[in-house]
Amino acid sequence: MKTRSALVAVSTAGLLLVAGTTAATVAHAADLPPGAPPGVCPVDTEHGPPLASPTTTASRLFGARTFLEGPVWVADPGYLLMSDMRAATGPQRVQPSTMLRYTPGPATVETVVAESGSNGLALSPDGTSIVAATHDQRSVSRYQLADLSRQTVAATFQGAAFNSPNDVTVRSDGVVYFTDPDFQRGRRADAMNGRTSVFRVSGSTVTLVDDGLRQPNGIALSPDGGTLYVGAYGENKIYSYPVRADGSTGPRTLFASIAGPDGGTIDCAGNVYWASGTDGLVHVFSPTGVKLGTVASGAGTTNVAFGGTDRQTLFITSGRTGDSGLYSVHLGVPGYPY
């Protein structure tokens, strides 16, 4: 999730930018666990263009919410979960949030976790739980779908509390990557000393990916697991990182530039979809960074996920006051459930 202030757009990307990390040999994609959740992307399938038109428009499914974020599709039995974030409260000025469930045909919307504390959501590789960026406890959490019980995945790095974990993605072997800007830290102590970072969780071990980004926000993995994408909201840029077989990453490069990059997702052809909270569009890029077009929805677009019976419906959350809602459009390629 972003702040509500507008940022100025920057020019289209194309130059290489290397982070202050040590370069290392990256494993070939064939040696990597896939980034796509198991069963989502058909193997050895040719895909056509994702957009019928370079300027596509989504339809509104429902509104009258506060600030929707973090959509994730649960294929069995077939519903979409998302976070609804409210205004900051209490002396620490922390934003409460609920977890909602949208079920299509006939459409219903209901609260499943009244105080989830969540922002970005992802699906575990076995499909039994939701991995959530939970800013209420400055942690990454796991919600079991069977009973919605909550467990902590990660709460500190080298003994220091995170700022406010924002968005999350999970590799097929269970390695978790998440962003940690300070948007929902409120008045709680800055244990990160001004740094906003990207982290990796392998088992119980938390490792720093990058602490040189200004307000990292959305995060996603390529279908072959070989590339990690991160949107830096404070820089108007989307970066990519090569991923090694053990989950570690190489130097970042500039993938694309859009105004206010929020949440992102990937389709099974490797195309990259990124929500812009500034212009209210979802920007679509090829795996090489070529701009394919945009999808228009509500102002203040926050995040995206694929779902539906054929996984070709792109769900889009919008969070701007007065225009918060869920939108959808059917596309030509199936994609990730978060």
Give the location of each predicted region.
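C-terminal region of N-terminal signal peptides and the immediate post-cleavage residues
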Residues: 18-36
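A short helix->beta-strand "capping" segment at the edge of beta-propeller domains
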Residues: 37-65, 104, 252, 332
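A short beta-strand motif characteristic of beta-propeller blades
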Residues: 56-62, 107-113, 151-158, 205-211, ...
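Beta-rich, blade/repeat-based domains predominating
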Residues: 64-78, 94-96, 113-134, 158-176, ...
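Short, conserved, GDST-rich strand-edge loop motifs in beta-rich repeat architectures
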Residues: 82-94, 178-193, 326
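Short glycine/acidic-enriched loop and turn motifs that connect beta-strands
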Residues: 87-90, 137-138, 183-186, 235-237, ...
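Short loop/turn segments that connect beta-strands within beta-propeller blades
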Residues: 102-107, 144-148, 201-205, 242-247, ...
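Blade-level signature of beta-propeller repeat domains, shared across WD40, Kelch, NHL, RCC1
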Residues: 303-338
